A protein has these predicted regions:
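Short, low-complexity intrinsically disordered segments enriched in A/P/G/S/L with frequent Arg
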Residues: 16, 21-23
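Membrane-interface helix-loop junctions and terminal tails of multi-pass membrane proteins
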Residues: 6-12, 24-258
């Protein structure tokens, strides 16, 4: 079996066109194959970057346009997620959230190297969106658009709320975006879960359920108050969601994404 190399192959001028014609297609097209392979790894990362960018951009912008209208804010987040999960599901799995990626890792559906690449793309998307919002609306709006704990809520209570809300989200992700038995409902179901979680948890913690949703604005506005809550809670809840679905719901193991 001939295996094409990604390194260019030198052809002497005396070889002429006949020499080129005699080369196997696998060698002639090796550069195209390598380029295609590189793009195949880049496309999911670009999809995650764009989807996460959209979520943070709309999320912060909703605070500028809707203010304290929790229904409008919840719908803005939920509809954005529904649209971009649907748009990226066939490209990257429509994760758009480091906690969801961690849940899929715990559920056995993604490898550690892939998870790290996805985390970088998601966090960069969040930072880029927050920086643009900073230039458009100013630091005050970015801070107002960053999920925060209610005055009467402790950090431990915030972690518990974020963990439970993220558990719901990751469980739904496994049941729709991952499990082929429910994949047709993924965008709607995940968007609806985000909307419902924000309607309940928005007044308590801001219902981030997504470290990138907090990390991007924190970097842009240099606002780190109770920041760890929005990593610990979602990652614990995401891990539990992945483990529970894998152990108790799945009928048979599913393919791991490289």
């Amino acid at each position: 079996m001939l295996v094409a190399s990604c390194s260019p192959r030198r052809i002497r001028p005396s070889d002429g066109g006949a020499r080129r014609a005699a080369l196997p297609n696998s060698v002639v097209n090796s550069k195209s194959i390598c380029l295609h392979g590189g793009m195949a790894k880049f496309r999911p990362l670009l999809a995650e970057f764009i989807g996460t960018f959209a979520l943070i951009f709309v999320g912060i912008g909703a605070m500028k346009t809707a203010g304290d209208n929790i229904v409008a804010v919840a719908l803005a987040h939920g509809l954005t997620i529904a649209a971009f999960v649907s748009a990226t599901l066939h490209i990257s799995g429509g994760q758009l959230n480091p906690a969801v990626t961690f849940g899929l890792l715990c559920g056995g559906h993604i490898t550690w190297p892939s998870a790290f690449r996805y985390w970088i793309a998601q966090l960069l998307g969040g930072i880029a969106a927050a920086l643009i919002c900073l230039s458009l609306f100013g630091r005050g709006v970015v801070i107002a658009g960053t999920p925060q704990l209610a005055i009467n809520l402790t950090a431990a209570q915030g972690i518990l709320v974020e963990g439970i809300l993220t558990f719901f989200l990751v469980f739904v992700v496994h049941g729709t975006a991952v499990d082929p038995r429910g994949r047709g409902l993924a965008g709607f179901a995940i968007g609806a879960t985000i909307t419902l979680d924000i309607l309940f948890g928005g007044p308590l913690t801001g219902a981030a359920m997504n470290p990138a949703r907090v990390f991007g604005p924190a970097v842009a506005a240099n606002f780190w108050h109770d920041h760890y809550v929005y990593w610990v809670g979602p990652f614990v809840g995401g891990a539990l969601g992945g483990f529970v679905y894998r152990i108790f719901i799945e009928r048979k193991p599913m393919t791991v994404t490289e």
